[in-house]
C-alpha cells in the first residue's frame, strides 16, 4: 500500500492546475478534460478569495483501480459461497505483493449495481488472474470486480486557506484518494458537483467524494451527484488535539494525533481569537472553553504552541481540545448518492440543514 510513503507531510508531489493566490477570478472550463497519468494533485486552490471554477472534468488515463470480470463461478455446498476465477483487464496487471483486498466491489453484469459480497480467501495466479472463495448473493460469470490498491493520496481538488470559493458543474471521474478536500477555508460552495465514474466504469474516488476540515462560514453542497466512491460522500469535522507539553498554566504545546495525520497532511492549528473546547475523552463532556490569545504553528514538529486566556487544569490526562470556531454551518440540498461504501453524510458540526437528498 503506497499510502504509508506517499501520504505524509514531507512527500513531494506534482500539482497540475495551481490557482494559488488568485482573487476575484472566474475560470470557465466547460468541455475541458484534465486527463491525469499517475499520482498527483490535479487542482489546487490555496490562498484564494472570490474564485469560481466551472465545468472542469478530472479523469485518469490509467484508472487508479483495477477492474476484472468473473470467468468461472462454481457454487460450493454453503449457500451463496463460490469458487471464483477473475481475469483482470490488460491495463491492470498485479503482482503477488499488490494489495487486492483494501476495498473492493462486485458489480452486476447487467445493471452495474454493486452486489453484497466478500472474499473469504484469495490466491494470486498470475499478473492478470486470481482465484478466490467468495460469499456473495447472486454472483455469476460476467460480473465485474473492482479494487483499489491504496486509500489516501492527494485529492483531485484541494481547497486550502481560501475564502468564498465555488465549484460549479465540476466532474471528478476518478482519483487515487478523495475528490474535493477543503481545509481551513471559509464559505465554500459546490454546485452540481458530479463525482461519478467515467462511462463504462464502476469506481470513482478511492475514498471520500468530498471531505472538509477546520472550515468556517457556510459550506454548501447543492444538487450534487455521487456514485461508486470508496467512502462517505461528505465528511465535515474539526480535529481533536492533545496537550503534549506544558509551558505554564495558560501556555502549552498541542498536537493532533490521528494515525494518518490530517486529510491534507497540513498542520491543524487555531487562530488568535478562536474558541477551544476542553473535552473529557471518557464521556465527551465539555469541561471548559478558552480563547486563544497567541499561537505559533510548528509544522516541522507537527504541533503548535498556544496561549489561552485563563489557566488549564493541573492535569490534562484524558482530556482533548477542539477548535469549535472552525466548524461551519453546513447545507446539503438536493444531492444524491448511490453504490458507494461507508456513510452518505457524516457531520460533526454544531449546525446543519440537510434536505431533499436521495441516498
Regions found by a protein language model. Give the residues of each.
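Ser/Thr/Gly-rich low-complexity blocks that favor extended beta-strand/coil architectures
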Residues: 36, 60-62, 67-73, 85-125, ...
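Long amphipathic alpha-helical scaffold regions
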Residues: 185-219, 247-262, 358-359
Amino acid at each position: 500500500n503506497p499510502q504509508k510513503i506517499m501520504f505524509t507531510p514531507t512527500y513531494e508531489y506534482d500539482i497540475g492546475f495551481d490557482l494559488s493566490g488568485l482573487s476575484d477570478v472566474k475560470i470557465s472550463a466547460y468541455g475541458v478534460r484534465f486527463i491525469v497519468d499517475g499520482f498527483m494533485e490535479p487542482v489546487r486552490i490555496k490562498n484564494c478569495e472570490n474564485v469560481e471554477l466551472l465545468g472542469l472534468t478530472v479523469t485518469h488515463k490509467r484508472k487508479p483501480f483495477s477492474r476484472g470480470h468473473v470467468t468461472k463461478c462454481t457454487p460450493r455446498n454453503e449457500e451463496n459461497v463460490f469458487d471464483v476465477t477473475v481475469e483482470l483487464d490488460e491495463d491492470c496487471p498485479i503482482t503477488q505483493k499488490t494489495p487486492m483486498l483494501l476495498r473492493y466491489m462486485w458489480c452486476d453484469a447487467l445493471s452495474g449495481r454493486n452486489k453484497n459480497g466478500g472474499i473469504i480467501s484469495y490466491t494470486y495466479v498470475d499478473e492478470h488472474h486470481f482465484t478466490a472463495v467468495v460469499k456473495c448473493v447472486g454472483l455469476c460469470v460476467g460480473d465485474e470486480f473492482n479494487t483499489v490498491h491504496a486509500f489516501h493520496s492527494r485529492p483531485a481538488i484541494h481547497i486550502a486557506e481560501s475564502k468564498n470559493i465555488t465549484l460549479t458543474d465540476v466532474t471528478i471521474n476518478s482519483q487515487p484518494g478523495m475528490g474535493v478536500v477543503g481545509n481551513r477555508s471559509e464559505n465554500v460552495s459546490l454546485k452540481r458537483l458530479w463525482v461519478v465514474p467515467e462511462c463504462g466504469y464502476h469506481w470513482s474516488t478511492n475514498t471520500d467524494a468530498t471531505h472538509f476540515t477546520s472550515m468556517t462560514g457556510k459550506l454548501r453542497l447543492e444538487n450534487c451527484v455521487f456514485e461508486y466512491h470508496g467512502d462517505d460522500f461528505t465528511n465535515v469535522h474539526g480535529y481533536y488535539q492533545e496537550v503534549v507539553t506544558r509551558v505554564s498554566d495558560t501556555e502549552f504545546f498541542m498536537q493532533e494525533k490521528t494515525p494518518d495525520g490530517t486529510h491534507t497532511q497540513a498542520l491543524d492549528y487555531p487562530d488568535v481569537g478562536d474558541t477551544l473546547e476542553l473535552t473529557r475523552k471518557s464521556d465527551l463532556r465539555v469541561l471548559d472553553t478558552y480563547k486563544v490569545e497567541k499561537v505559533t504553528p510548528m509544522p516541522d514538529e507537527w504541533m503548535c504552541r498556544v496561549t489561552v486566556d485563563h489557566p488549564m487544569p493541573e492535569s490534562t490526562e484524558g482530556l482533548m481540545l477542539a477548535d469549535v470556531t472552525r466548524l461551519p454551518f453546513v447545507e446539503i440540498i438536493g444531492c444524491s448518492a448511490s453504490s458507494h461504501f461507508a456513510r452518505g453524510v457524516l457531520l460533526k458540526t454544531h449546525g446543519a440543514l440537510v434536505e431533499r437528498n436521495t441516498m
